Each structure stands twice: as C-alpha cells, then as structure tokens.
C-alpha cells in the first residue's frame, strides 16, 4: 500500500504534535508538511528524529509543494475555516478535529466537500471510548426521561459546551424523539447549566483536566451514569488514523466518527 501523504494544520499545537508523532510510527502514513501560524522556520523536525518536513504559515504554499492526500486540522474555528476553504480549492481531503463551528459554517464545509468532489470528515471527538459513550447514551435515552450532561476540560479549551457534549445532547434527543423532563425552576439563572429540551449541560474548565464527560440519567429509585475520561491525547490517535485511512476513499461530507464505526 502506498503511504497516505498528510499535511498537519496546527502542527505546533499539542494535538498537532501528537498527530505528527503518531504518523511517524505508522508505515501506511507519511507526514509531508506542517502548517502553523507560529511558523518561523522553513522546516519542522519530526518528533521521532527521522528528519524534517516543510513548515510554513502559508497553507497554500505547503499544499502546492507537498501535494498531500489529506490535511488534518486541529486548530480553532476562526483559523480552521479559511484553511478548509484553501484545502478544498486544492482538492485535498480533510480530517477536521477542530470544534466550535456555527451551523452555518458546518453547512459551508458540507458544500465545499460536494463542490470540490473531496472527502471531509468533521468529528467533535476522535476517542473511540467517547464515541461509544454517546452511542450508549442514545440507547438509554429511549427508556429514561431525565438526564444531565457534565463535561470537564482543560482551561485552555475555548468553546463551551464542548462539541462532544452538544453532539451527545442532539443524539439523545433524536433517540428519544421528544424533550426530556424539564428540571425544576432554578432560583439563580444558569446555576444549573444550559438547558437543551430538558437536558441540562454543565461545563467545567480547570487546569489539570484534559477531556472528560459523564451523562447521568435518573429515574425513581435509580440512576445510570455513563462516563468517559481522556487522560492522554494518545487516546484520539486510533480514531484520527481511521479517519485519514477512510476519507481518501470517501466523497462528500461525514459528520462524526460514529459513521465510520457504523454504530
């Protein structure tokens, strides 16, 4: 199998570095370029010490120079949207792990995939355990009508609620087919989190955390808690590799890693 050539956008960030390290360990993937707004030199040393790859803040230049099969994006929505447009114009498939997009931006990303005849996967979470957590929450939502979501992340995460929390809530509501039980009236506005059709969502941002979420269901005499904890960014890499592998054979827009797992 010819290795899949990959450019990483947001390469100097923590997720970008983890992606590059993982790609270097795999025979079927080949990192060929790195892009980051903080780039100050024309080359970036690979994490495994095997050499260096072209490095620039100019995405279009890197894509023209390296001719990748896939661009992996882990940045912020404000930086990601212009990069997605550029990559799509270059006919480069995309794996997007950035969150915080508006519904209008997601619609634009879907249209870019169609217009440019490329594959784009946008996934709020690449941890396989987190995907299974959402799936189990969907199952429970068919039977239990009171639920709350608590998501906890590191203090550098900009968006709240997290993309995973929003996807979890949407999936639960879809599975249930109606609103959950409305919680009692609160005396202090937003003291019990943000309400989504009866589901309260609570966001915690603290140093020392990475990415954690629990979905708590309650019924008379019982509770059910479904929880996922990410302690290291390594947990996202199997999902990222799966997305890269599949997107080169996929046309159009895919939202969520669960579609590739066929859950």
Curated annotation (Swiss-Prot):
GO cellular component terms, A-Z: cytosol
Chain positions recorded as NADP(+) binding sites: 38
Residue stretches in coiled coil: none
Pfam families registered for this protein in UniProt: DapB_C, DapB_N
Binding residues annotated for (S)-2,3,4,5-tetrahydrodipicolinate, in chain numbering: 154, 163-164
UniProt GO MF annotations: 4-hydroxy-tetrahydrodipicolinate reductase; NAD binding; NADP binding; oxidoreductase activity, acting on CH or CH2 groups, NAD or NADP as acceptor
EC number, as in UniProt: 1.17.1.8
Residues forming the catalytic site: 153 (proton donor/acceptor), 157 (proton donor)
UniProt key word Glycoprotein: no
CDD domains (alphabetical): DHDPR_N
UniProt pathway annotation: Amino-acid biosynthesis; L-lysine biosynthesis via DAP pathway; (S)-tetrahydrodipicolinate from L-aspartate: step 4/4
Reactions catalysed: (S)-2,3,4,5-tetrahydrodipicolinate + NAD(+) + H2O = (2S,4S)-4-hydroxy-2,3,4,5-tetrahydrodipicolinate + NADH + H(+); (S)-2,3,4,5-tetrahydrodipicolinate + NADP(+) + H2O = (2S,4S)-4-hydroxy-2,3,4,5-tetrahydrodipicolinate + NADPH + H(+)
Keywords attached to this entry: Amino-acid biosynthesis, Cytoplasm, Diaminopimelate biosynthesis, Lysine biosynthesis, NAD, NADP, Oxidoreductase
Domain of life: Bacteria
GO biological process: diaminopimelate biosynthetic process; lysine biosynthetic process via diaminopimelate
Localization in the cell: Cytoplasm
Binding-site residues, NAD(+): 10-15, 97-99, 123-126
Entry-linked HAMAP family: DapB
Family the entry assigns: Belongs to the DapB family.
Its job: Catalyzes the conversion of 4-hydroxy-tetrahydrodipicolinate (HTPA) to tetrahydrodipicolinate.
Identification of the protein by name: 4-hydroxy-tetrahydrodipicolinate reductase
Organism of derivation: Dehalococcoides mccartyi (strain CBDB1)
Gene transcribed to yield this protein: dapB
């Amino acid at each position: 199998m010819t290795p899949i050539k990959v450019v990483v956008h947001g390469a100097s960030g923590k997720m970008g570095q983890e992606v590059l390290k993982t790609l270097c360990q795999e025979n079927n993937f080949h990192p060929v370029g790195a892009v980051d707004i903080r780039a100050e030199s024309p080359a970036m040393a690979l994490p495994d010490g095997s050499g260096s790859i072209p490095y620039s803040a100019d995405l279009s230049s890197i894509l023209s120079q390296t001719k990748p099969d896939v661009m992996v994006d882990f940045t912020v929505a404000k930086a990601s949207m212009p990069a997605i447009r550029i990559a799509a114009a270059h006919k480069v498939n995309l794996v997007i792990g950035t969150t915080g997009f508006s519904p209008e931006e997601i619609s634009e990303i879907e249209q870019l995939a169609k217009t440019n005849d490329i594959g784009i996967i946008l996934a709020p979470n690449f941890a396989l355990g987190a995907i299974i957590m959402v799936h189990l929450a969907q199952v429970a939502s068919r039977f239990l009508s009171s639920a709350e979501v608590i998501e906890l992340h590191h203090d550098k995460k900009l968006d709240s609620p997290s993309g995973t929390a929003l996807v979890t809530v949407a999936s639960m509501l879809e599975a249930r087919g109606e609103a959950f039980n409305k919680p009692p009236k609160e005396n202090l506005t937003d003291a019990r989190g943000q309400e989504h059709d009866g589901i309260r969502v609570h966001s915690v941002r603290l140093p020392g955390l990475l990415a954690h979420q629990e979905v708590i269901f309650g019924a008379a005499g019982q509770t059910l808690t479904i929880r996922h904890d990410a302690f290291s960014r390594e947990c996202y890499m199997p999902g990222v590799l799966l997305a890269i592998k599949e997107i080169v054979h996929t046309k159009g827009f895919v939202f969520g890693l669960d579609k590739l797992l066929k859950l």
